[in-house]
């Protein structure tokens, strides 16, 4: 049994002392691929410092963890560091799309909605994912570009979006028309 597996079992048994010992051994002895999986698990259950330590160790072999590191840095309020991690992901990487989406989110958090929109526009050139289109619609709405927001909302399947986000495109389109002074 790998140290990572022993750590997970110890966490499940609420034996954090043993979990910490197995964590340290895992960092020294377990294969990098296993560490990435452990990092993802630890991140998902809120053990962010441990996940971060793993990601820092493997980030040059697994550059996709830079997205995770950026999210952890943002959680800690270190937006500048988050951008540094995201900038380490090259445009030809499979993870570049994820990096753009996280960048858009960070710019949005910083109140730079125009820049966030630009990042989502770039992401929309790489993928037609409905959540990217939804993000663009929401940003256009927030910026007061209601006609553009309506066009984006109209591209979305209301049932799918409602199930994913709890947001009705019909309601958003209605609000956008109302903001334009068109009440019919």
For each predicted feature, which ranges?
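Canonical tetratricopeptide repeat
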Residues: 5, 37, 68-71, 102, ...
